[in-house]
Curated annotation (Swiss-Prot):
Component of the INO80 complex which remodels chromatin by shifting nucleosomes and is involved in DNA repair. Residues 115-168 are annotated as: Disordered. It is found in: Nucleus. Keywords: Chromatin regulator, DNA damage, DNA repair, DNA-binding, Nucleus, Transcription, Transcription regulation. The keyword Magnesium does not apply. It holds the Pfam family Ino80_Iec3. This is INO80 complex subunit 3. Component of the INO80 chromatin remodeling complex.
Length: 168
């Protein structure tokens, strides 16, 4: 009889652990289903936003359609190609109307034309040290000073006469 009781105990213990694992698995599968649904929505929104950007870009400089044939945003007629402008500042001097569906874009481009002077000027290279106000030469000299301090510390602690006596 003792072996039957131990078998029942082991069986019940395994049954509890199995049930808990089954519940965890069901919860994980439910989370995966929710995440895949969100993933599909994000893919659709991303495709829609890409097509909006391409549409906006085609009003300034026409580009070929990026959507593959068969997608809901694919256009049957290709966009005509034009010769690209020499400098990027010429893009902002063009006065082409943006589609009426993109009113916020027309406001944004008008604002960027009037207020953003950096669009026409070339960006120069800045090192991270310069953005903090540190010149590269002073950074190298401070590194040399700190390494010489370490060497001095090592030299002073080497001699037995310079060691401190322990308090008892």
């Amino acid at each position: 009889m003792a072996s039957v009781k131990s078998f029942k105990r082991k069986y019940l213990k395994l049954r509890k652990s199995f049930d808990s694992v089954v519940l965890e698995t069901e919860e994980i599968e439910q989370k995966i289903a929710e995440i895949s649904e969100v993933y599909r929505r994000i893919l659709l929104e991303n495709a829609h936003l890409n097509d909006l950007l391409i549409d906006m870009n085609s009003t300034v400089l026409p580009t070929p359609p990026a959507s593959p044939p068969g997608s809901p945003y694919w256009e049957a007629k290709p966009v005509s190609h034009t010769v690209f402008l020499e400098s990027p500042s010429d893009v902002f001097t063009l006065e082409k109307p943006i589609a009426s569906t993109h009113r916020w874009l027309s406001k944004l481009t008008a604002l960027s034309k009037s207020t953003n002077s950096t669009l026409s000027t070339p960006k120069s290279f800045h090192s991270p040290l310069q953005s903090r106000g540190i010149s590269p030469s002073s950074a190298q000299s401070s590194a040399a000073v700190s390494s010489s301090r370490k060497q001095k510390r090592k030299r002073t602690s080497e001699g037995p006469s310079e060691r401190r006596a322990r308090k008892k």
